[in-house]
């Protein structure tokens, strides 16, 4: 697995509320060990996942969300 900001189609982040459990739930549903609400410059608050399966897309730096 890998760590990163989990991506929606088109390289968009999943927005979140700092301190909420939403990202942890989302990441675990996708097969990660855990997740939390982080901050991605240029995108704002975004879900970060730890040990996400390689088949699940993560945000690619420099690519704009379409």
UniProtKB/Swiss-Prot annotation:
The set of disulfide-linked cysteines is 12-65, 16-37, 23-47, 27-49
Q: Name one GO molecular function term.
A: toxin activity
Q: Which GO terms describe its biological process?
A: defense response
Mind listing the UniProt keywords for this protein, alphabetically? Disulfide bond, Ion channel impairing toxin, Neurotoxin, Secreted, Toxin, Voltage-gated sodium channel impairing toxin
Where in or outside the cell is it found?
A: Secreted
- Domain LCN-type CS-alpha/beta span(s) in chain numbering: 2-66
Its tissue distribution reads: Expressed by the venom gland.
GO CC entries: extracellular region
| InterPro entries on file | LCN-type_CS_alpha_beta_dom, Scorpion_toxin-like, Scorpion_toxin-like_sf, Scorpion_toxinL, Scorpion_toxinL/defensin
Q: Cross-referenced SUPFAM superfamilies, in alphabetical order?
A: Scorpion toxin-like
Its function, per the record, reads:
Alpha toxins bind voltage-independently at site-3 of sodium channels (Nav) and inhibit the inactivation of the activated channels, thereby blocking neuronal transmission. As it competes neither with the classical alpha-toxin AaH2 nor the beta-toxin Css2, this toxin is an alpha-like toxin.
The record's family statement is:
Belongs to the long (4 C-C) scorpion toxin superfamily. Sodium channel inhibitor family. Alpha subfamily.
How does the entry describe the domains?
Has the structural arrangement of an alpha-helix connected to antiparallel beta-sheets by disulfide bonds (CS-alpha/beta).
| Name the record gives this protein | Alpha-like toxin Bom3
Organism phylogeny: Eukaryota, Metazoa, Ecdysozoa, Arthropoda, Chelicerata
């Amino acid at each position: 697995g890998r760590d990163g900001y989990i991506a929606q189609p088109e390289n968009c982040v999943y927005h979140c509320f700092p301190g909420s459990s939403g990202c942890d739930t989302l990441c675990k549903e996708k097969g990660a060990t855990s997740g939390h609400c982080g901050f991605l410059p240029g995108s704002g608050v975004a879900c970060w996942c730890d040990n996400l399966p390689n088949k699940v897309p993560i945000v690619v730096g420099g690519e704009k969300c379409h």
